[in-house]
Amino acid sequence: MITVFVACLFQCVSSLPAKLYIKTTLAERIGKLQTVIGIDNDIVFAYERLYEDLTLLNHTVVGETLFDLTGSLEEGKNSTVDRFLGHVVIREFHRLHAGLQYVSLRNFSVSELVCFVNNNTQLSGSYVFLAGNTTYVQIDLFNENRGFVHDLINLSSFLQNRSLHVLSFYARRFCVEDILNFYGKVVFGDSRHRPPQVFSKRDTGLLVCTARRYRPIGTNIQWSIQNQTVSDDHMTDDFIRTEIAGQLLYSYERALSRALSMTQRNFSCEITHKLLVTPALLTREDAFSFKGFVNPVKQSEDMFPRHNFPAPHRKKFNKLQLLWIFTVIPIAAGCMFVYMLTRYILFFVSGGCSLNPNRVLKRRRRNDEVPMVIMEVEYCNYEADDYMELHSVQKVRDNSIAVVCGNNSFDIERQSKISRNF
């Protein structure tokens, strides 16, 4: 089993963050390919197929996907959401129609999901890819008839039943959220909850309303206090440059003056775009319901088997690492604790004595008043003639030395007794 994991953290450019995961597994011997696409740990698409012609595996790079976070507002486009499903869907199409001469992986290197707002302020989305190196095929994701601009390739046999509803789900969810970031009246007052478009700068305390990661062409932010428009004299503008995947984007911020930010309470922030004449037609419900697919996530779970899909940003430990973490390290720490505890118990039970003379010396120098013990061991054995241990040498206050007992001291004391007897 050869397993290839391709994982990418997809941060949506609107106020809706999303994590996009793609997991592709290839069983080479049986020719089984499984592709699972998930968002925020929910499976929205799982495709599994057995291939009789194993020679197709030699012409396919499994797990290679293209993620390119881009944004654009020129020429009527409100945003290019992402190039996230291009390789997955098209590679599946290539496997199903491998006998066609005009189908090749190289021909489908250009693909993107685009959101538009037409002159009637209606939201529309298309999936565009390049076929045959010269022809662009555009699929209308918001049209239930799903007409194609060019009928060179009949994609309905595959896309309509397998992947088209997934593409439509992504388009409607992200495109709507993306465009709504240019039209949203954010009202807040005494409530502690503050919407993500509004924040306070820590250094200055200014109240800021922002439209993040967009080109500022046609974008407008207007502050209001108690339904009264704030003049431009009390606001400051700021553009922040951000480069994502080679695409230069901006964040447009408009901050209230410090006096208004600190004294007023009832604020409202309105983000608009010049292309949206009647933006009320765009509602957030469009992101989760559309014709033919009431609940695309639920339908995907019913149509395709659900698989365990771990988040790729979480670190996975192998069995050896888990053995060290939960077995070896705790046992070693426990043994060290028992060893140290045993040493301390033996030390205090023995009356504070230690085999190290330096410790005894320091302790006795602090505690003894008259004699200062330099070294001591066991009690003296005066009865033994052949063996005598060195026991203690004491220094008295008058600088005289009292020899208690020991091999040398016993000899000295013994010699003195002999001399006195004579």
From Swiss-Prot:
Residues 1-15 form the signal peptide. It is a single-pass membrane protein. GO terms for cellular component: host cell endoplasmic reticulum membrane; host cell lysosomal membrane; membrane. It comes from Human herpesvirus 6A (strain Uganda-1102) (HHV-6 variant A). Keywords: Glycoprotein, Host endoplasmic reticulum, Host lysosome, Host membrane, Host-virus interaction, Inhibition of host innate immune response by virus, Membrane, Signal, Transmembrane, Transmembrane helix, Viral immunoevasion. This is Glycoprotein U20. GO terms for biological process: symbiont-mediated suppression of host innate immune response. It is found in: Host endoplasmic reticulum membrane; Host lysosome membrane. Plays a role in the down-regulation of the host stress-induced NKG2D ligand UBPL1, which enables immune cells expressing the NKG2D receptor to recognize and annihilate infected cells prior to viral spread. The chain crosses the membrane at residues 322-342. It comes from the Viruses. SUPFAM superfamilies: Immunoglobulin (SSF48726). Glycans are attached at N58, N78, N107, N119, N133, N154, N161, N227, N266, N407.
